[in-house]
């Protein structure tokens, strides 16, 4: 398994969308299978995966945006948002987030 690193923006968003139990399930899912999400084209390697909230199914779930740095064993959780309330995040914004991570 890999280490999950929550970015400050992700932390601000996740508590409003997922219970602590759901957050644990999500982190386990991603750390056990870091390639589960689709790579967002032109994003610098950012991945996007759907996660179903309890009682909501995938259509009532969230999208989770994350970035793998598997060579050092880390997966960075970047964003999480309700599918019903937010459209796709533009690739150039995701690419900028990756650039920011590379300064960490």
Residue map of PLM features:
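Arg/Lys-rich, positively charged N-terminal/basic patches that mediate binding to nucleic acids
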Residues: 1-21
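Membrane-topology and secretion signals of cell-surface/extracellular proteins
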Residues: 11, 20, 43-46, 92-95, ...
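Basic/aromatic recognition patch in beta-strand/loop cores that engages polyanionic ligands
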Residues: 37-79
